Amino acid sequence: MAKAKFERTKPHVNVGTIGHVDHGKTTLTAALTKIGAERFGGEFKAYDAIDAAPEEKARGITISTAHVEYESPTRHYAHVDCPGHADYVKNMITGAAQMDGAILVCSAADGPMPQTREHILLSRQVGVPHIVVFLNKADMVDDAELLELVEMEVRELLSKYDFPGDDTPIIHGSARLALDGDQSDIGVPAILKLVEALDSFIPEPTRDVDRPFLMPVEDVFSISGRGTVVTGRIERGIIKVGDEIEIVGIRDTQKTTVTGVEMFRKLLDQGQAGDNAGLLLRGTKRDDVERGQVLCKPGSIKPHTEFEAEVYVLSKDEGGRHTPFFKGYRPQFYFRTTDITGACQLPEGVEMVMPGDNVKMVVTLINPVAMDEGLRFAIREGGRTVGAGVVAKIIK
């Protein structure tokens, strides 16, 4: 059969497998690529190829992640699978592989285990919007009542962390049988049912270009006779000449109008997400804008100083701290383009945090930063990255 050419016409959705060690995440990933390749195009990736995930660096943190792709009738999926629990924690906190939805793999024989819970909690903290469940190893459970019991436990766990437990699709199956081509209900058909659930339950993500305009300020220039130009990479949305924008963060919010959009020293009518652009601002002085602020669509993002975060602290081997830190720790928090000092408040009963740990903390910054829940940041000490985090909840 001729190899199907990759068509960009299908919408692209990012997913990944989460769940306890040895519950079958990688086997399921292999089964998805195999059945996807047979039915809808794409290429089969064997278990061993996925399991030998290469190490990559994201923000100075070493993470092993396997990336595979498969198709459904209507979509193209990019799927991440991590070999170890620590890789999941790092991956989710750094946002190295952003997920529009996750496939929670839970063994029907064992039921929910500690990492099942931890991955659901992490998904909530880092803003994974949707979870679909695959109850794996269903061939090892003869008792239908036991299956129902495990399903109930998983639903309760999802609800506990504010996912819609009662409405979540839960598919029973065996990834191993499906890989072997088994045609019984829990074999290949279960994988097809899972793909259907992904298609229907995980909404298509809003493309960056369709979201409200935002550009982090990287540099500010004053051009005589023309005014102030602010440069940066447009993170989301579209900006046109004549648009009103706000300058948010660090100091009081100001309003201004964009009178010019430049790229590669050419004047354009508009810039969009992904472009490196220079924006000419009307009546704005060079000292009114600084690195660390953002330009945005008015009202679309607010400045905040206090938030709850989920943080991964780099291990010594990753170039992080060699010693733990305690409450009252005051490092710099690097948001988008700048460092802002902040104080850390640790959870009750946590006296210290060791390199290599992940922890929930409340951070109070000395200056406000434009932020939404889900924004990633680095923790630095004198320019050296010692941690990575994500804004889980804004307090004020």
Swiss-Prot record:
One of its GO terms (molecular function) is GTP binding. Disulfide bonds: none annotated. Residues 174-176 are annotated as: G5. Residues 136-139 are annotated as: G4. It catalyses: GTP + H2O = GDP + phosphate + H(+). Belongs to the TRAFAC class translation factor GTPase superfamily. Classic translation factor GTPase family. EF-Tu/EF-1A subfamily. HAMAP family: EF_Tu_B (MF_00118_B). This is Elongation factor Tu. It comes from Xanthomonas euvesicatoria pv. vesicatoria (strain 85-10).
